[in-house]
């Protein structure tokens, strides 16, 4: 269970940086687990900013890469672009600080999270998310203890999640096969 929570936290943090969402959709008791930098980014969004993010998210399949998406964002809102780049740089610096094994693992999580986005803007497939989480858990369990510890230190929000009994129960229920 401990491993599942760590991985769900990593996936959640990654998804927060890959898929625009509204902080208002997250129950209050879980908001504390979202990194402060991510919370601040979403807290400062205007209605117009949210609409721009929704529009660009619906077109994500048309962007060759993250830089192309950021350029499209810059064309829509310079302020939003600067905030997004700041958040991206924060996450990138955390990832770049990791040793090779941990970095490869996080890069795989990001790639997996990006692959879950639907090209047509429809709702995410819950079964695909569950399978992706199971795959990531298996990879995580194969990591050395040193690498696991490095991930916990680099992503401190994970430490909060590990001790939360309600989240442990929810994660276990969510990942159960039908």
From Swiss-Prot:
GO terms for molecular function: fatty acid binding; retinal binding; retinol binding. The keyword DNA repair does not apply. Not glycosylated. The keyword Signal applies. It is found in: Secreted. Its main location: secreted. Keywords: Coiled coil, Lipid-binding, Retinol-binding, Secreted, Signal, Vitamin A. Residues 1-16 form the signal peptide. Residues 67-89, 130-153 form a coiled coil. It holds the Pfam family Gp-FAR-1. GO terms for cellular component: extracellular region. PANTHER family: FATTY-ACID AND RETINOL-BINDING PROTEIN 1 (PTHR31418:SF7). Binds retinol. Also binds the fluorescent fatty acid 11-((5-dimethylaminonaphthalene-1-sulfonyl)amino)undecanoic acid (DAUDA). The long chain fatty acid oleic acid can act competitively to displace bound DAUDA and retinol. Belongs to the fatty-acid and retinol-binding protein (FARBP) family. This is Fatty-acid and retinol-binding protein 1. It comes from Brugia malayi (Filarial nematode worm).
């Amino acid at each position: 269970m401990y491993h599942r929570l760590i991985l769900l936290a990593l996936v959640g943090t990654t998804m927060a940086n890959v898929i625009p969402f509204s902080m208002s959709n997250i129950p209050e008791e879980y908001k504390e687990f979202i990194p402060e930098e991510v919370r601040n980014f979403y807290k400062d969004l205007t209605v117009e900013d949210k609409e721009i993010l929704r529009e660009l998210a619906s077109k994500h399949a048309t962007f060759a890469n993250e830089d192309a998406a950021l350029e499209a964002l810059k064309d829509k809102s310079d302020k939003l672009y600067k905030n997004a780049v700041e958040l991206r740089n924060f996450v990138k610096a955390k990832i770049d600080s990791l040793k090779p094994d941990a970095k490869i693992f996080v890069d795989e999580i990001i790639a997996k999270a990006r692959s879950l986005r639907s090209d047509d803007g429809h709702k995410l497939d819950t079964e695909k998310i569950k399978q992706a989480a199971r795959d990531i858990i298996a990879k995580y369990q194969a990591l050395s203890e040193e690498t696991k510890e490095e991930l916990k230190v680099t992503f401190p929000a994970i430490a909060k999640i590990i001790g939360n009994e309600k989240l442990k129960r929810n994660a276990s229920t969510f990942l159960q096969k039908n």
